[in-house]
């Protein structure tokens, strides 16, 4: 669920942090892992440190970001598996952002419908403006591409099927947790 209380990321930015890369590689080498993997760290603003969250032996949900930034991991994996490339290049553009648009909408919807006792609810209008501005200035999306709109249309179709229950929830008022 993409809620103001937390959940999967809906907007990501490509950064370059050699210390995180080195830490992730050390973990994968210690596991003798070969193949795609996601090593996730979470930043703690209190102490300024990154902490390991999880290691998943698969491609990750936010795969559109590195592809948009210039590293097509699925293609590289295919090329490595078929002998098409000996040493892959991982040069990418930092500062590139990518949206999960359905997640952004779900986040805004949660502001209207959810109520969490220990988490301050953000104001809808500033969040709507911030997301709108970000979508205009960083128009890269996980499922929405003008040259291949079908994945986004499928997601939109699935959302349309949920519309009756979403409307019912909205009219019922905030959910409390």
Residue ranges and their predicted role:
Residues 36, 64, 86-87:
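Secondary-structure boundary/capping residues
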Residues 37, 49-54:
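Protein kinase-like catalytic core scaffold
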Residues 40, 65-66, 91:
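Short acidic alpha-helical/loop segments enriched in Asp/Glu that coordinate divalent cations
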Residues 42, 51, 77:
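Active-site acidic catalytic loop and adjacent metal/ATP-binding pocket
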Residues 79-177:
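Peripheral (often C-terminal) accessory segments that flank ATP-dependent C-N-forming ligase machineries
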Residues 34-45:
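A short glycine-rich, hydrophobically flanked beta-strand micro-motif that places a catalytic Asp/Glu
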Residues 45-47, 82-83:
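Short acidic-glycine loop/turn motifs at beta-strand connectors
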Residues 1-32, 56-81:
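ATP-dependent carboxylate/phosphate-activation module, predominantly the ATP-grasp catalytic core
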């Amino acid at each position: 669920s993409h809620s103001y209380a937390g959940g999967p990321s809906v907007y990501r930015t490509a950064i370059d942090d050699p210390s995180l890369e080195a830490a992730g590689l050390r973990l994968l080498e210690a596991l003798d892992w070969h193949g795609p993997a996601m090593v996730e760290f979470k930043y703690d603003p209190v102490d300024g440190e990154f902490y390991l969250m999880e290691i998943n032996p698969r491609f990750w949900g936010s795969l559109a970001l590195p592809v948009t930034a210039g590293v097509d991991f699925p293609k590289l994996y295919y090329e490595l598996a078929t002998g098409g490339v000996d040493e892959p290049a991982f040069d990418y553009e930092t500062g590139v952002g990518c949206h999960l648009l359905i997640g952004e909408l779900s986040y805004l919807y949660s502001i209207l419908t959810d109520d969490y006792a220990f988490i301050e609810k953000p104001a809808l209008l500033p969040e709507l403006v911030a997301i709108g501005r970000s979508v205009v200035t960083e128009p890269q999306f996980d499922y929405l591409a003008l040259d291949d709109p079908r994945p986004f249309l499928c997601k939109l179709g699935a959302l349309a099927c949920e519309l009756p229950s979403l409307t019912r929830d909205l009219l019922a008022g905030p959910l409390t947790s």
